[in-house]
UniProtKB/Swiss-Prot annotation:
Disulfide bonds: none annotated. The lineage of its organism: Archaea, Thermoproteota, Thermoprotei, Thermoproteales, Thermoproteaceae. It catalyses: dTMP + ATP = dTDP + ADP. GO terms for biological process: dTDP biosynthetic process; dTTP biosynthetic process; dUDP biosynthetic process. InterPro entries: P-loop_NTPase, Thymidylate_kin-like_dom, Thymidylate_kin_CS, Thymidylate_kinase. PANTHER family: THYMIDYLATE KINASE (PTHR10344), UMP-CMP KINASE 2, MITOCHONDRIAL (PTHR10344:SF4). Belongs to the thymidylate kinase family. It comes from Caldivirga maquilingensis (strain ATCC 700844 / DSM 13496 / JCM 10307 / IC-167). This is Probable thymidylate kinase.
Amino acid sequence: MCIFVDVEGIDGVGKSTVIRLTADELRRRGYLVYTTSEPSDSPIGLFIRRSILESNLEVEPMALALLFAADRVIHYNRVIKPKVKEGYIVITERYIESSVAYQGSQGVPVEWIIEVNSMVAEPDLVIVLNAPLNTVASRLSNRGMLEYFERNTDFLRSVQEVYLRRARERNYPVIDASRVINNVVNDVLTLIEDKAKGKCKNYNQ
């Protein structure tokens, strides 16, 4: 057995880069690491990604929350749980808190979102990456997504507020992701290694 880590934050905050660099360094330090993301590669996850997100299909927020929850059950039972049992530090980009933040910002009751996700385990550690919206805009612009940001600025601000409120309520660590990437990664590494002590095998020791 090892641990399950969820890295959260709004679009453009740097989750993918931080997870990739963190995983590389954890492996260098002797840990088994498995990275994943949501929507997952399950049939439902692929449907969400290709038929809804990539095509900008309008879907009732409550229905979308149910689709994410269904994908999450498959993702947890078929990928996350087995890998944790095999001794991997599993790091996912997005999990339950993404549904809380995004569908919650679309008017879906947070209590209901949590209830429909109660069939999967909570992570051992949830890390929220945060950055000013102008930093996020710059990063999305570099990815050719400035138009997306400009269309969704108010929504992303609302999502960010939900993340920060949840972090306060649930004592999730919030990392300033506007800094130099090495500093961000070092903070995430410290949090994960502290949680992994006594639970995950380090093959360098």
